[in-house]
């Protein structure tokens, strides 16, 4: 991966999950959010177009309301999503304003991708935001998408949503920040000698078997990231899986440093 050049990544989708911005004790990780925003603004200063996909609305609300865990009742999850989304955007806007960076919120559901007219309208708005040098901030609309909140048709903590956005806007690549800093040959939480896999050219059954577990506050896990990677590889796109604990790793990886796992077709 050290020899890989990402200079041609001019349009990038960056996705962050709940486990990166909300800690296990339900506290909002403001230092990480600050570093992340600084990194996204640095990408903009490199004249790259940036689309930011974020999870965390429910996790933020859990913190704000002092809940111990994510509730199972869908109406309560909807209410938390509504509260948390407003708080989450306020936190992001406060951080982005320090760098005088304009942002715009886009909330999506599966219906948007299934409806050509709705999809066209969304893309028109997103393209205009990019022309304005704004950073679109995308999240799943959990207030409306009830079926997705009980995880029957979940985007997967926005991993698959980010992959679909990457494809539909013809971005050069997707970067996913995760609580796991790479894909490993075995579970790094259980095996101290687990080794990071630097590059994956196809999502085989063997690769899928490496995925296990998920965070308590979010809906995703390594399996949803592999699902996103498989979708992107099928559409001739690339994906980087990087540690969420080090947002500036995005800049290091794009400069060619060997960080995380790159998912790319063999001929890339």
From Swiss-Prot:
One of its GO terms (molecular function) is glutamate 5-kinase activity. Keywords: Amino-acid biosynthesis, ATP-binding, Cytoplasm, Kinase, Nucleotide-binding, Proline biosynthesis, Transferase. Its EC number is 2.7.2.11. Pfam families: AA_kinase. InterPro entries: AceGlu_kinase-like_sf (IPR036393), Asp/Glu/Uridylate_kinase (IPR001048), G5K_ProB (IPR041739), Glu/AcGlu_kinase (IPR001057), Glu_5kinase (IPR011529), Glu_5kinase/COase_Synthase (IPR005715), Glutamate_5-kinase_CS (IPR019797). It is found in: Cytoplasm. GO terms for biological process: L-proline biosynthetic process. The keyword Nucleotide-binding applies. One of its GO terms (cellular component) is cytosol. Gene3D superfamilies: Acetylglutamate kinase-like (3.40.1160.10). ATP binds at residues 15, 178-179. It catalyses: L-glutamate + ATP = L-glutamyl 5-phosphate + ADP. Pathway: Amino-acid biosynthesis; L-proline biosynthesis; L-glutamate 5-semialdehyde from L-glutamate: step 1/2. Transmembrane segments: none annotated. Substrate binds at residues 55, 142, 158. CDD domains: AAK_G5K_ProB (cd04242). Coiled coil: none annotated. Belongs to the glutamate 5-kinase family. Catalyzes the transfer of a phosphate group to glutamate to form L-glutamate 5-phosphate. This is Glutamate 5-kinase. It comes from Oenococcus oeni (strain ATCC BAA-331 / PSU-1).
């Amino acid at each position: 991966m050290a020899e890989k050049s990402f200079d041609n990544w001019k349009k990038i989708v960056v996705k962050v999950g709940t486990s990166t911005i909300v800690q296990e004790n339900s506290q909002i990780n403001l230092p990480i959010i600050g570093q992340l925003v600084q990194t996204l603004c640095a990408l903009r200063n490199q004249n790259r177009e940036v689309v930011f996909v974020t999870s965390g609305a429910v996790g933020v609300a859990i913190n704000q309301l002092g809940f111990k865990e994510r509730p199972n009742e869908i109406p309560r999850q909807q209410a938390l999503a509504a509260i948390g989304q407003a708080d989450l955007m306020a936190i992001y806007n406060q951080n982005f304003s320090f760098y005088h960076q304009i942002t715009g919120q886009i909330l999506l559901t599966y219906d948007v991708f299934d409806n050509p007219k709705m999809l066209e309208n969304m893309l028109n708005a997103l393209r205009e935001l990019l022309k304005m040098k704004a950073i679109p901030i995308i999240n799943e609309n959990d207030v409306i998408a009830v079926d997705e909140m009980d995880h029957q048709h979940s985007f997967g903590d926005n991993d698959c949503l980010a992959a679909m956005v990457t494809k539909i806007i013809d971005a050069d690549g997707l970067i996913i920040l995760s609580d796991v800093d790479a894909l490993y040959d075995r579970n790094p939480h259980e095996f101290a000698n687990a080794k990071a896999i630097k590059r994956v050219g196809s999502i085989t059954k063997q690769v899928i078997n490496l995925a296990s577990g998920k965070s308590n506050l979010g809906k995703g896990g390594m399996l949803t990231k592999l699902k996103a990677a498989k979708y992107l590889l099928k559409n001739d796109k690339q994906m980087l899986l990087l540690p969420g604990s080090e947002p500036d790793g995005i800049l290091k990886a794009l400069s060619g440093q060997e960080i995380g796992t790159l998912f790319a077709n063999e001929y890339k």
